[in-house]
Amino acid sequence: DYGIKYGGKLHEFKTEEEFYKFLGMDWIVPEMREDTGEIEAALAHKLPKVIEVKEIRGDIHLHSNYPIEPSHDLGKDSFEEIINKAKSLNYEYVGLSDHSPGVSTHTRNQIVKLIEKRTKKIEQLKSSIKNIRIFNLLEIDILTDGQLSVPKAGLKMLDGAIAGIHSSHSQGKKTITSRLLT
């Protein structure tokens, strides 16, 4: 699989690393192969260092199967399963950031009540699990008018939020940008 004809001779290689070296390049990890200047950087031996899994200290964008009646799909694992996996990876922290409750199926008061119930569960975990930091987060929709899908009373219960546009993607560039900046 790793071969090249050069000077009328077939040069074969056992690894990609050997192949790249033959071409005078540093090996480019697959994650970096995006046609954004990595070939030039490899030829100049100036590729950036890739973060290794052991260097990752945590993850703040994790969706659980907690029944918050979200605007989008639930995750597959429970809070406890997520935390146990994070601990097995030696993470220092996790952010439980499920999608917020759907605005088309809940009143603002119902959204706050669902967040309150979820927050109580996360607070119980925070008090019983001491060797990893747990953040109570939500992924919140930015609505078509630029407002957030979670009322301020719900936001106050969170450690933070991830806000994103999940609907009306066909709006014009100016409108979409305005939604993000509101």
Where are these regions (language model features)?
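Hydrophobic residues within beta-strands of alpha/beta enzymes
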Residues: V94-L96, T182
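Short connector loops at secondary-structure junctions
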Residues: L96-T105
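Extended substrate/RNA-proximal surfaces in nucleic-acid metabolism proteins
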Residues: D1-G58, H72-D77, E81, K87, ...
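Histidine-centered divalent metal-coordination motifs
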Residues: H61-N65, H99
